[in-house]
């Protein structure tokens, strides 16, 4: 899908893209999973080459942040959750050339959707491509901060479940949720660090106006303040995982203890019963009139004696 926006009274206004000269008046050209015809239109009308899918997947810094004859290029991760609530990071290719911002992405992203909603009533200060880029990065950082807050809330709820000593099935669910929260935290951290590198590159390479330079530094300060919070999440997740595993081990030890008690109580009587159950001809006890009750009494004594002894020694 191809969308374009122009500046009207210092606000973004969406273009209908019916006329061939509409793109030439645009300030921001946004492409989401573009078809080949849309790529060709951008190339024909604006002379702009767009990144390919393999180029979006490159992770080395030289392929994500660079400047060439086609403009200033920044490839940056954006966080999203799909229809099944699975977290992921999607790469967005930003290009600034001739005062115009190009964005190429593979899916609709929450940060872009939120920014377009805000842009309807938001007045731009300078109304240039760099301001748009930094506004999108600001929106992304706000979204990541919200995700960190959500993880904190989820971990607080999990902490109560784990520390209150629930049943084994609830521990299994808690461990699964902890693994999911750790995965989300890792993706958020990856986004933060990637955005930090992108902004440092932008500050070094682009001749930013003073207002955008201060805006970039403000976003960098926000990232630096969020990274320690994100790191503390991993420590909290690790602590809760260890606590949950510890409680699971305690529960397993209780079960093993029950089997140990059963073994201590029933193994000696079983030995007595099996001894008198052997089919030998010369077993004098078999002819005794009190042989059966005597064997029963011996089995009871053989079961109680080791149990009481082990209990006194606190071995059970």
Curated annotation (Swiss-Prot):
Transmembrane segments: 258-278, 290-310
Keywords: Cell inner membrane, Cell membrane, Ion transport, Magnesium, Membrane, Transmembrane, Transmembrane helix, Transport
Domain of life: Bacteria
Site feature location: Essential for ion permeation: 253
Subcellular location field: Cell inner membrane
Single GO molecular function: nickel cation transmembrane transporter activity
Chain positions of motif Probable selectivity filter: 277-279
Membrane topology: Multi-pass membrane protein
InterPro entries listed in its UniProt record: CorA_cytoplasmic_dom (IPR045861), CorA_MIT (IPR050829), CorA_TM1_TM2 (IPR045863), Mg/Co-transport_prot_CorA (IPR004488), MgTranspt_CorA/ZnTranspt_ZntB (IPR002523)
Keyword GTP-binding appears in the UniProt entry: no
SUPFAM superfamilies associated with the record: CorA soluble domain-like, Magnesium transport protein CorA, transmembrane region
The keyword Transport is assigned to this record: yes
Physiological role: Mediates influx of magnesium ions. Alternates between open and closed states. Activated by low cytoplasmic Mg(2+) levels. Inactive when cytoplasmic Mg(2+) levels are high.
Notes on the domains: The central ion permeation pathway is formed by the first transmembrane domain from each of the five subunits. Mg(2+) binding strengthens interactions between subunits and leads to the formation of a symmetrical homopentamer surrounding a closed ion permeation pathway. Low Mg(2+) concentrations trigger both a conformation change within each subunit and a loosening of the interactions between subunits. This results in an open ion conduction pathway. In addition, this results in a less symmetrical shape of the whole complex.
Subunit structure: Homopentamer. In the absence of Mg(2+), interactions between subunits are weakened, and dimers, trimers and tetramers can be observed in vitro.
Family: Belongs to the CorA metal ion transporter (MIT) (TC 1.A.35) family.
Protein name, entry field: Magnesium transport protein CorA
Gene: corA
């Amino acid at each position: 899908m191809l969308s374009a926006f122009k500046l009207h009274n210092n606000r973004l206004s969406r273009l209908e893209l019916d006329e061939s000269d509409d793109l030439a008046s645009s300030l921001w050209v946004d492409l989401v999973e573009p078809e080949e015809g849309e790529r060709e239109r951008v190339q024909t009308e604006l002379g702009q080459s767009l990144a390919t899918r393999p180029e979006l997947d490159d992770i080395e810094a030289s392929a994500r942040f660079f400047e060439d004859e086609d403009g200033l290029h920044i490839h940056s991760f954006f966080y999203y959750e799909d229809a099944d609530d699975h977290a992921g990071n999607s790469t967005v290719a930003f290009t600034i050339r001739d005062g115009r911002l190009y964005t190429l992405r593979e899916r609709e992203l929450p940060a872009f959707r939120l920014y377009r909603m805000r842009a309807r009533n938001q007045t731009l200060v300078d109304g240039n491509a760099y301001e748009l880029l930094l506004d999108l990065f600001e929106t992304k950082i706000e979204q990541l901060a919200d995700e960190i807050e959500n993880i904190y809330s989820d971990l607080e709820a999990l902490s109560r479940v784990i520390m209150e000593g629930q049943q084994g099935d609830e521990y299994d669910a808690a461990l699964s949720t902890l693994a999911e929260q750790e995965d989300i935290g890792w993706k958020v951290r990856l986004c933060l660090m990637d955005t930090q590198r992108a902004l440092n590159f932008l500050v070094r390479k682009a001749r930013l106006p003073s207002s955008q330079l201060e805006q970039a530094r403000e976003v960098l300060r926000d990232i630096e303040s969020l990274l320690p919070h994100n790191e503390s999440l991993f420590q909290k997740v690790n602590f809760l995982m260890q606590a949950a595993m510890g409680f699971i081990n305690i529960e397993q030890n209780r079960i093993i203890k029950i089997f140990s008690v059963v073994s201590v109580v029933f193994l000696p009587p079983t030995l007595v019963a099996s001894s008198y159950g052997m089919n030998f001809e010369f077993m004098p006890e078999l002819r005794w009139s009190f042989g059966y009750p005597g064997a029963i009494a011996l089995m009871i004594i053989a079961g109680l004696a080791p149990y009481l002894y082990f209990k006194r020694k606190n071995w059970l």
